[in-house]
A protein has these predicted regions:
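Fold-independent oxyanion-binding glycine-rich loops
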Residues: 2-5, 30-33, 39, 54-56, ...
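Short, well-ordered, mixed-charge alpha-helical segments that flank or form enzyme active sites
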Residues: 6-11, 36-40, 45, 59-62, ...
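Active-site C-terminal subdomain of aminotransferase-like
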Residues: 56-142
Length: 172
């Protein structure tokens, strides 16, 4: 599932979903592209088995980097799965990573930009970083409402704000 649905700006209650999925044998995999870097997603506490993110959106960089984090339960599935791999194989990538390498060309400028972003977040402190994102989201929502606009989502995310156009809007 998604932590935040981009087109609607909706925040999903991943913590509650994680509790439900944890009572089954299913893996709980979360698309965190719009969430990671924008608000807390504690994998262990929320019973998340796999968290996938990218450098765009929540991490505040251009597209080009992917991040994957797995629980031990998820890694066990990855390492024992018998399904064929056609392009990307996490087992091969893990082996390369253990040797300090990657299977594909590393976009060095994006890695350096990531270092800059992470250093800045570390300087500020994670709680303060998330607080600042919440402050900006609250301000954006406040200003939209002050302009007579309404939010699209009843459960808005702090990472993206979707605003409904007025019914009489003409254009685009």
């Amino acid at each position: 599932t998604q932590a935040c649905e981009t087109s609607t700006g909706t925040y999903h209650d991943i913590e509650s979903l994680g509790k439900i999925v944890a009572e089954t044998e299913a893996l709980f995999i979360v698309d965190g592209i719009t969430a990671v870097g924008a608000f807390p997603i504690p994998m262990d506490a929320w019973k998340i088995d796999g968290l996938v993110a990218g450098s765009q959106k929540g991490v505040m960089l251009p597209t080009g980097l992917s991040f994957v984090s797995f629980s031990e339960k998820a890694w066990a599935h990855v390492l024992t799965a018998k399904t064929p791999r056609y392009y990307f194989d996490l087992r091969r990538e893990l082996k390369a990573n253990q040797n300090g390498e990657t299977l594909f060309s590393t976009p060095v400028p994006l890695v350096k930009a990531l270092e800059f972003i992470l250093t800045d977040i570390q300087r500020l402190g994670l709680p303060q970083h998330f607080k600042e994102i919440r402050r900006r989201a609250d301000f954006t929502r406040y200003m939209a409402k002050a302009l007579g606009l309404s939010l699209f989502s009843k459960s808005p995310s702090d990472s993206i704000t979707a605003i409904s156009l007025p019914k009489d809007f003409k254009g685009v």
